Amino acid sequence: MSIDRYGAPGCDDLAVCRLTADGMLDCVYELDGHMRVLNHDGCTVSTVQASTVPKPRSWPGGACATADGTLFVSNRGPNTISAWQRSGPTRHFLCEWPTGDWPRALCAVPGTLYLLAACQREGAVHCYYCSPLPRRAPTETASLALPGASCALVLD
């Protein structure tokens, strides 16, 4: 399978999230601020802005998907996290909430409803409880000071 990583002029793929059972691939593009769903041939089948906040401009920093198919995207610029659900080839908006300065990486904690966000310029990793989306906004449950935080991983 070849993927056209230059789906739009001036864009670059930053995060390839998951290949779904139907052969679709979720991609987040940093430079043009969009999310795309690609088919098995690498062709774009849908495109949506990664953040619903119009200004400042969004540069998605990272993304992760949960077992139920929820896609979380960190939006640098507006400093938010957006949550999306896919139905067929398109993504549908669930919610968006503020987070720390310059969210660079996200990690869904397997087997839980927790999400970690590494916020680089703030120098912190934030932990959010994400249930039930979209009826209730996620709540921050912890924050860890970590200068230059740029990655969040769960290690066994």
Residue positions per predicted region:
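Beta-propeller fold detector
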Residues: 1-6, 45-50, 92-98, 136-146
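Conserved beta-strand positions in repeat-built beta-propeller and related beta-rich domains
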Residues: 21-22, 27-31, 71-77, 117-120
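Long, well-ordered mid-to-C-terminal structural blocks that present hydrophobic/aromatic surfaces
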Residues: 30-72
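Structural signal for beta-propeller blades
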Residues: 33-36, 79-81, 123-125
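Short loop/turn segments immediately following beta-strands, especially the blade-tip
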Residues: 38-45, 84-90, 128-135
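Blade-level signature of beta-propeller repeat domains, shared across WD40, Kelch, NHL, RCC1
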Residues: 120-132, 137-156
